[in-house]
UniProtKB/Swiss-Prot annotation:
Aquaporins contain two tandem repeats each containing three membrane-spanning domains and a pore-forming loop with the signature motif Asn-Pro-Ala (NPA). Glycerol 3 binds at G199, F200, A201, R206. Keywords: Cell inner membrane, Cell membrane, Membrane, Repeat, Transmembrane, Transmembrane helix, Transport. This is Glycerol uptake facilitator protein. It holds the Pfam family MIP. Glycerol 2 binds at Y138. It comes from Escherichia coli (strain K12). Transport of glycerol is blocked by mercuric ions (Hg(2+)) but not N-ethylmaleimide. The record marks W48, F200, R206 as: Substrate discrimination. Residues 1-5, 61-63, 79-84, 170-177, 255-281 are cytoplasmic. A motif (NPA 2) lies at residues 203-205. The lineage of its organism: Bacteria, Pseudomonadati, Pseudomonadota, Gammaproteobacteria, Enterobacterales.
Length: 281
């Protein structure tokens, strides 16, 4: 298979995997907000976590199941991921999230309309932000912009560090097929503990793609600003990227360097030609 066709298949996998996790997660929130479903924070967090686990099972063998631009960037910087694939992966992830949000909206369309009519909500007003939160994340009204950024950075750093730990066969017993479920459980635990603060985005694609859809679907600028002076979309867009870089750096320097093998070093040795190895002596 050519490199081009391989990249195409990987991008399709990232599109479908990211779309799948958004379909389950946003669908759960839509059921809560407009269909009268009774979910607590833990139940919502578990559904998001299981959605991620299912998406990983679907795509891991094709693309590695990044499903998150922050993860893709961190793996490029700290785990030898091919830099030429970074932009295509990110575009695929955002597109998958956008399309899944649109699909959920289409399936729940009548319920959204009836909910707005019943509660006299004008789409695009500040009062409609809570309903826009069906698709993407907005902060608790009691925390400010900087605090929200710090929350997203910290929880994504924890997520990234533990993803590397859970998928590193050199770090204890190999997890194999259990790794996706453990990652899903990790997301559920983070969501249950920190979700009430920012909605635990931890994923620029998960947040930005659906925000773009909400903007197009009538929520307008409030979808990006969240009704705040500083556009809130910047927090779940850049906070997770910074956090993932910090988490990957911390794992590599504090844990990974003390393990028996170094993945990047091994890969570099395997790709070095005999003449290059001789020249390096």
């Amino acid at each position: 298979m050519s490199q081009t066709s391989t990249l195409k298949g990987q991008c399709i996998a990232e599109f479908l995997g990211t779309g799948l996790l958004i379909f389950f997660g946003v669908g759960c929130v839509a059921a809560l907000k407009v269909a009268g479903a009774s979910f607590g924070q833990w139940e919502i967090s578990v559904i998001w976590g299981l959605g991620v686990a299912m998406a990983i099972y679907l795509t891991a063998g094709v693309s590695g199941a990044h499903l998150n631009p922050a993860v893709t960037i961190a793996l490029w910087l700290f785990a030898c991921f091919d830099k030429r694939k970074v932009i295509p992966f990110i575009v695929s992830q955002v597109a998958g999230a956008f399309c899944a949000a649109a699909l959920v909206y289409g399936l729940y369309y009548n319920l959204f309309f009836d909910f707005e009519q019943t509660h006299h909500i004008v789409r695009g007003s500040v009062e409609s932000v809570d309903l826009a939160g069906t698709f993407s994340t907005y902060p608790n009204p009691h925390i400010n912009f900087v605090q929200a950024f710090a929350v997203e950075m910290v929880i994504t750093a924890i997520l990234m560090g533990l993803i590397l730990a859970l998928t590193d066969d050199g770090n204890g017993v190999p997890r194999g097929p259990l790794a996706p479920l453990l990652i899903g459980l990790l997301i559920a635990v983070i969501g249950a503990s920190m979700g009430p603060l920012t909605g635990f985005a931890m994923n620029p694609a998960r947040d930005f793609g659906p925000k773009v859809f909400a903007w197009l679907a009538g929520w307008g600028n409030v979808a990006f600003t969240g009704g705040r002076d500083i556009p809130y979309f910047l927090v779940p867009l850049f906070g997770p990227i910074v956090g993932a870089i910090v988490g990957a750096f911390a794992y590599r320097k504090l844990i990974g360097r003390h393990l028996p093998c170094d993945i990047c070093v091994v890969e570099e040795k395997e790709t070095t030609t005999p003449s290059e190895q001789k020249a390096s002596l």
